[in-house]
Amino acid sequence: MAQHFLHSKESRNFAKALNRVTEDESESYLALCRWGPDNKQACPGCGVFRKHYRRKKRRRWRCAEIACRHEFSVTSGTPFHGHKLTFKEILLLIFAFTTNANGASLLQVSRRLGLTPKSVQANFGKIREVLIHGLDLTPMTGTVHVDGGHFCGKPRKPNHKIRMPKDAIAKRYGKKKPASTTKPWVEMGMTKQNYLRLAHKRVVIVFTQAGKLGEGSRRSIPIVCRRECDEYAFPLMKAFVRRDAIVMTDESGAYTGFTALGIEHHQVKHSEMFSTSEGVNDNMCETFFSRMRRAEYGTYHGYRPKYLQDYAIEHGWRDDNRRASQDELVNKLTGQIFGSGKSNWWRGYWQGNHRQGELTADWFLAKAAA
């Protein structure tokens, strides 16, 4: 049997080097990821890219342009702008984010690095924000699997099984139930608390593009929606899948009308089989949801609707880079982080600067159209 990738030496080829890294080496590595190997820097004040004056003791640079003279560090103008961490701690945080296949627990990283859980939460939130803004939304081609998975709003099992007699509702309210006294949770045979939890239920509709034979999924676009229906599925399909693609889904009614869009569409009835004899399946979506659910139960112990999209994008990134070596993951993510601007959603989070509301499908559709 072939060896799993996580058993290979490439999956751990950065850990030993990171254990011996110094503060100077950490700063040099972050500068390399941000500005390249030419020993030149881009001044955040005037934007001039050249070799600026180094202030070694303060670990900063001063702009060489006379009209500017702006002072900056390697983290200025990045998501880590105004941080109170050492450069090695920043590098260790990025490493901790990438090294776990199903995500990293805040308390586990906090104990490992000696940082407060608040600091880990805010900085991990900044990394997820970078992944959201850096998500590749170009329309998919080739074979594309589409499916929806339900998260959040999970009901809790009661201590005693609620068994409602068939005529219990009629005995209590008569033949016609008054609208003011109707209790839908009684009709559904659940507690009021569980009925209220259903309001937090969300659906993640994921589009996965197949790679070569045996390669599995190559790219994922997970979008959080209120329901799994054509109201959400059709606009997302138009925006993220090309008309010459071959789309495979399950038998859900949300996807039955895809042929009207001029797309070759095949469905598999999951009530009867996982895959048809012709090979029609949506197993790449099921693989994505399997990893995301394992993280929900085993790592994060639950998602919340407001930040469910952040976690979905994180797991999409992990799924797309599942075969990358350890140093490739760190290099790629660090370059992406230090190539972006300041954080808007997590800068000053513990001082009350919170993102308002959930990220919706309309947000991604507008971004794709821009």
Question: What are these model-derived regions, one by one?
Answer:
Residues 1-370:
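Residue-level recognition of single "structural anchor" positions
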